[in-house]
């Protein structure tokens, strides 16, 4: 890891995709179980 100040594009895409997927899954499961209405 010599380039610490520069973040590779694939890492940003992976982290962004996992974050979006996780939020989507939590939202779907929350609304399915009835907890999504409290949000």
UniProtKB/Swiss-Prot annotation:
Quaternary structure, from the entry: PSII is composed of 1 copy each of membrane proteins PsbA, PsbB, PsbC, PsbD, PsbE, PsbF, PsbH, PsbI, PsbJ, PsbK, PsbL, PsbM, PsbT, PsbX, PsbY, PsbZ, Psb30/Ycf12, at least 3 peripheral proteins of the oxygen-evolving complex and a large number of cofactors. It forms dimeric complexes.
Family matches, as Pfam families: PsbJ
GO terms of biological process kind: photosynthesis
Keyword annotations: Chloroplast, Membrane, Photosynthesis, Photosystem II, Plastid, Reaction center, Thylakoid, Transmembrane, Transmembrane helix
Compartment list: Plastid, Chloroplast thylakoid membrane
Cited SUPFAM superfamilies: Photosystem II reaction center protein J, PsbJ
Superkingdom field: Eukaryota
Its membrane topology: Single-pass membrane protein
An example Gene Ontology CC term for this record: photosystem II reaction center
Membrane-crossing residue ranges in chain numbering: 9-29
Name by which UniProt lists this protein: Photosystem II reaction center protein J
InterPro entries attached to this UniProt entry: PSII_PsbJ, PSII_PsbJ_sf
UniProt entry tagged with the keyword Transmembrane helix: yes
Functional summary from the UniProt entry: One of the components of the core complex of photosystem II (PSII). PSII is a light-driven water:plastoquinone oxidoreductase that uses light energy to abstract electrons from H(2)O, generating O(2) and a proton gradient subsequently used for ATP formation. It consists of a core antenna complex that captures photons, and an electron transfer chain that converts photonic excitation into a charge separation.
Predominant place of localization: plastid
Family: Belongs to the PsbJ family.
């Amino acid at each position: 890891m010599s380039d610490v100040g520069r973040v590779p594009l694939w890492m940003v895409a992976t982290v962004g995709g996992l974050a979006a997927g996780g939020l989507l899954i939590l939202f779907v499961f929350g609304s399915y179980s009835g907890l999504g209405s409290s949000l």
